[in-house]
Amino acid sequence: AISDICIHRGSSLSGGKILKNNCLQCPYHGWEYEKGLVKHIPGYVDSTNRNYGVPQFEIKEVNDDIFIRPTFDINSKKGNTYNHTIYVPPEAKDPNFSRISGKRHIIRPNNIISENVLDMMHISYVHSFGNSLSPVPFNMKYDDINELSGKSTFHYTAGPNSMSKIIGGANYVTVENEFYLPDVTVTRVTANNIVKTIVTHCYPIGQNESILHFDLYRNFLQSPVCDPLFHYQMKLTLDEDTQILYRIYDDYMLGFMSTKFDITQIKYR
């Protein structure tokens, strides 16, 4: 993986193409890059001594996902590395759970999107599966997992239109909200014997836009035939989330005041 910004005129390299010599060609002026270093400039004699180009990043495949370390440039050997592992939820290794995955392009900063996922108080006011008659969480508890992660546990009354109520038959659900810096959130909902866990990764692709990746694990309705149902549920949930996120004023996204129900977002910051 390399930086997307051509060093000539700043064009997006992802719009280019891979040539037969395995170089990436810039779509603007045809500069060619090999592992981030400039290999050929149209109109100039090729040189094997070129040691300039764009940053090259380490990539790693974990749990069928591709991760990039954008803080360290392999070519220049400059940047920062951090001693932490990539988080993989226990559900990923549990044969009793099925998984679906997806992504959403959202015109909002990535930190605000992740904070919304961790927000316990918005559930009943924003989401159709919430309980507007009993919207306030109870029995809340927050604990630091380590210096880079934390976890909130709380309970709330199951909404009449929620899977927890309809399928799980639960009057009350237990929710575990976790974060693992820099960008992982985990929301685990337990309703009697059924468990649904949503893991998200959110990264910026511009000043005010991001890509949210999600994995949904469940230990019920495990047949692939049921996957479209959960994809639809995630689409509806993200539609409701983005609708409210787009109504937040750009200059006031961090708000002015916080309550005890904002503990997870505050710790995440």
Predicted regions and their residues:
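C-terminal catalytic domain of Rieske-type non-heme iron oxygenases
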Residues: 79-269
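Rieske [2Fe-2S] iron-sulfur-binding domain
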Residues: 1-90
